[in-house]
């Protein structure tokens, strides 16, 4: 059986590199992002599927996993990589922008991990959830 990976928050940096590595190892790759148009070149390069998803929206995350179930079943690996860089001193940060960054990084990560765990634990897979706070 072919192993599979779902990469949420896919883009042109780290997640693209991880997608290439996974594809080179023979894994089936699904890329998820708010803007899937930006993923078209990578999609073609690694023969991936793409799904539009806002990781901070419960309905969008639920839809992502229902679509993923149809494409690859329960993924063997889920990578959560969305981020929002804040930059600057904590003294000068706009609290609304900080909230958005934490919402994307932590709450979105929780929503994805929860849906992934519901599927992956049925297959005795390990689930590791490590939210990383935005860089300040």
Protein language model features and the residues they cover:
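Active-site loop of short-chain dehydrogenase/reductase
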Residues: 3, 74-75, 120-134
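Conserved NAD(P)H cofactor-binding loop of Rossmann-fold oxidoreductase domains
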Residues: 81-87
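Rossmann-fold cofactor-recognition segment
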Residues: 46-59
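A short, exposed helix-loop element centered on a Lys and neighboring polar residues
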Residues: 113-114
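Conserved glycine-rich Rossmann-like NAD(P)H-binding loop of the short-chain dehydrogenase/reductase
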Residues: 27-39
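Substrate-binding pocket helix/loop in short-chain dehydrogenase/reductase
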Residues: 89-90, 94-102
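Conserved glycine-rich cofactor-binding loop
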Residues: 11-12
């Amino acid at each position: 059986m072919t192993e599979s990976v779902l990469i949420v928050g896919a883009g042109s940096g780290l997640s693209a590199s991880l997608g290439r590595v996974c594809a080179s190892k023979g894994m089936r790759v699904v890329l998820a992002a708010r803007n899937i148009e930006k993923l078209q070149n990578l999609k073609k390069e690694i023969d991936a599927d793409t799904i539009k998803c806002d990781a901070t929206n419960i309905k969008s995350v639920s839809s992502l996993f229902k679509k993923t179930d149809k494409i690859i079943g329960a993924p063997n690996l889920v990578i959560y990589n969305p981020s929002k860089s804040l930059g600057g001193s904590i003294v000068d940060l706009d609290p609304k922008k900080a909230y958005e960054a934490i919402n994307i990084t932590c709450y979105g990560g929780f929503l994805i991990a929860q849906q992934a765990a519901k599927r992956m634990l049925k297959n005795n897979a390990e689930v590791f959830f490590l939210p990383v706070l935005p860089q300040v």
